């Protein structure tokens, strides 16, 4: 089980990314717009750098919904491999079962 502080930190980052998403997109469009003046592009670059670091989606880490484990994460289920196996064995994940051939 991951520390509560790590799980909360990740939740805080998710909120921050959602909060600044539109602003980041607009600034990035301005920066990549070659028809805009160099001065405008430079201002947009400085504005983007002034945003909080945690507003960047690159800093997000996928974590298990139950344990908060960051490794062995299955995107399709939102669970780590350990919890996924446990849930499948209990029959909690529809359409998934243990392989047998």
UniProtKB/Swiss-Prot annotation:
* Natural source organism: Psychrobacter arcticus (strain DSM 17307 / VKM B-2377 / 273-4)
Q: Superkingdom of this entry's organism?
A: Bacteria
Q: Which family does it belong to?
A: Belongs to the universal ribosomal protein uS14 family.
Q: Which GO terms describe its cellular component?
A: cytoplasm; small ribosomal subunit
In its keyword annotation, does this UniProt entry include rRNA-binding?
yes
Description of how the protein assembles with itself and partners: Part of the 30S ribosomal subunit. Contacts proteins S3 and S10.
Function as written in the Swiss-Prot or TrEMBL entry: Binds 16S rRNA, required for the assembly of 30S particles and may also be responsible for determining the conformation of the 16S rRNA at the A site.
Family annotation (Gene3D superfamilies) = 1.10.287.1480
Report the protein name in the record: Small ribosomal subunit protein uS14
């Amino acid at each position: 089980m991951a520390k509560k502080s790590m799980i909360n930190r990740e939740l805080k980052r998710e909120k921050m990314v959602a909060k600044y998403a539109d602003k980041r997109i607009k600034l990035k469009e301005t920066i990549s717009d070659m028809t805009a003046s160099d001065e405008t592009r430079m201002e947009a670059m400085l504005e983007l750098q002034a945003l909080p670091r945690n507003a960047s989606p690159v800093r997000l880490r996928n974590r298990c919904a139950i344990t908060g484990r960051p490794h062995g994460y299955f995107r399709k289920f939102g669970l780590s491999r350990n919890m996924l196996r446990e849930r499948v064995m209990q029959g909690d994940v529809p359409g998934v079962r243990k392989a047998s051939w």
